[in-house]
Amino acid sequence: MTLLENGTHVLFGAELGSYSTSEAKLAKKVVARLPADALCLADRYFFSYPLWQAALVSGAALLWRMRADLVLPKLKRLADGSYLTKIYPSARARARDIGGIPARLITYRLGKGRGEYRLLCSILDPRKAPALQLVDLYRKRWTIETVLAELKTRLRGPRVVLRSRVPNLTRQDFWALLLAHFGVRALMHEAALEEKIEAGDLSFTHAVRTIARYLPLYVSFFPSPQEKTLQVTLA
C-alpha cells in the first residue's frame, strides 16, 4: 500500500506486508506518513473510524469517498450546499452522541440515473475549501491507478511475478522497483519544470525508454551536461 503525490506522480510512504496482512493494518502505517500540509484523497473502501482518526493525527486534511451504507447525519446545511456531520465508532456511540468526530459531507451526482456520490472532508469551513472545488479535486484520486500500472507493467515489463523466490529477496525486488519508479518520475518532474508543463503531460513509457538509452553514459546522478540533455529529451 502506498501514497501518491498527485503533482509529481511520485509514490511515497509505501508499506509492504505478507499475504495475510490486512489492508487496514497497512493503511494505518501509511497514513501516519502523510505530510501535515497535504490533502489526502481516498476511495470509499478505505474508510473506517479508526483509520480516519489515525489520518487526522498526521495533520493532513482528508477528502475520502464514503460507502452508501454508512450513516452520516446531516446536522447543518452550509452555504455551498455541503453539510456538517459527525462520524462515530459504532451505531451505539452515534445514538448516544459519544466519540463523534466533526466532518463535512458533500453529496453530488454525475448524471441522470446514476447513484449519489458522498465525500467526507475534514475541512469544516466551506470558505477555505468550497464543495465544487473539492469535487473537482477528488477526480485526481484515479491518478494513483494509472501510476500503479506504471509500476506493475510499464516499468517491470510483461512478467507476471517478481523474479525472486524467497521472501527477503522478494521484498528487495519490491523496494528496488519503487526506487526505480521514483527515479524515473523525479527526472520527468525536472523535465516538466524545465519546459514549464505538467509532469502528467509526459509519457512514462517514453521516459523509461529514453533513460534506458542514456543510462550507459551515467555512473551516478550528479548534475552533468548529459543530465541536462536527458531533461530536454524527456520533455
Segments and roles (model prediction):
Residues M1-A235:
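Single, function-defining residue in the core of a domain
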